[in-house]
């Protein structure tokens, strides 16, 4: 196998493409990079003679068919909802596919046909999902192999701004897809704690935070992710008493964000009338009761008492939410308008660096004694292109592609990297790129 097709040349593809182009001469690979923006694809290629850039439209079925026909292995860096379109074509033509995204129901439905045709559909090969699975499974297998019984598992991940570039009152900047941040946590959160099922509705999520100290970076708050329980079966820990997966933010973020949640400003289910004419102040006022004798600020603090807190109020004020400035978005949902406002203030600046933090905490029993084992990854990005997020999404995906191209992966059908023959080589090589977990253990 020598021909690799990469569909999508967005932010997350930087390290993936650089890795594959860097290894192309040694392995005799040719790489085609397609994106709706030819400029983006050509920019990622950078004139490298081992690749070609082209304009790609996922909705052009003939083009997709022709490109998949050319390839031995395809890698989809397109938005997750587009992966099944690529996957179906790959299965039809008997070509392997890799993605960094969660296994959707549509992807799962292709498992039997893919396996029959000898096709690998490798998914969840990024950071979250991806490195989280691989590093957790390495710890789980290690504890099991010495006879331990796992009783608790808490796994937290955060994509944040590096401390040296943290210069706003939210202690946060968008290092990844802003839309996902605005919509985070919607639905009901479900986890298991000390044998009890716990449910947190969206309107209470950001007031149900926990704090963790992660040296040398200090204190973080965590809000739980939506469905932690599905990982019991995936990881083979069905009898576990506690399993919680969460998202990390700097302390103080959740209380301020909760103001928007309580008002309904993160709703993405409807369009606001005349949204193109709304100022930021009018947008906020749309969610407050009519009272001609009160200012918007006064109404907000009456309706949402938390906004009376000076620190929270200053966060909101810094965002510009009280300004008489036009947002300028037609036919937009509240979530889209809020995202636009936040992107103006929380985008990465030219010299910014991000930081990725991931921590697993396992409680287990061995020989009648109780232990706790922590495994922590902290990685600071190089710049706004070679971010920690791009490195941890793209590099494991690239390593997996190399393994598949060189015959080291014999799994077929829908595959996740939760077996030692997959996660060990990927995690070991990631350490060469600075993606390394530090472990500590203590007896309880």
Question: Which positions does each model-derived feature cover?
Answer:
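Rossmann-fold NAD(P)-binding glycine/threonine-rich loop
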Residues: 101-123
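Rossmann-fold cofactor-recognition segment
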Residues: 48-60
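C-terminal catalytic/substrate-binding lobe primarily of soluble NAD(P)-dependent oxidoreductases
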Residues: 142-444
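Glycine-rich Rossmann-fold phosphate-binding loop(s) that bind the pyrophosphate
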Residues: 9-10
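Conserved Rossmann-fold cofactor-binding substructure of NAD(P)-dependent oxidoreductases
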Residues: 58-69
